[in-house]
Structure formats: structure tokens, C-alpha cells
Amino acid sequence: MEPREHISAGDRVFSIEDRPLGTVTGIIGDFFRMAGTDGIEGMLNASDIYTVEHHRVTMIFSSTSLREHQISRR
């Protein structure tokens, strides 16, 4: 199964440095919407997922690069 098939709303999202990034609020195809801990809402691609375990999604992004990624997509 693909990692995105294990994601559901309410899952917590973390960076590869184990910093909390936000919470999944919805899934649209190969993307999921996330409410960030910094107040920024964003869409992330499922291909950027590192692992999904026990309602915990770990992204390949560091917390700094994710913020830059979200801002560049606005």
C-alpha cells in the first residue's frame, strides 16, 4: 500500500528532525492539506512523505525547508 493510503484527517505531521509541523485536515488525490503549527495552511504532495505510522506522518522536509516550500507555493 502507498503511504498516502494510511493518512487520515487528524494525523499529526512531523519533520525529519522530529519537530511538530501541523495536523492533516484533508486529502485530495495525491495531496493532503495541513494546518501548520505556525498558522499556515498548505497542500503537501504525498511523494514528500517519509513514513506514516500510528497517525504520525513524517515528511522528508526539515522544518526550515518546509516553511520555505509552503511560502513559495503561495
Language model: regions and residue ranges:
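Peripheral interaction segments used for macromolecular assembly
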Residues: M1-R74
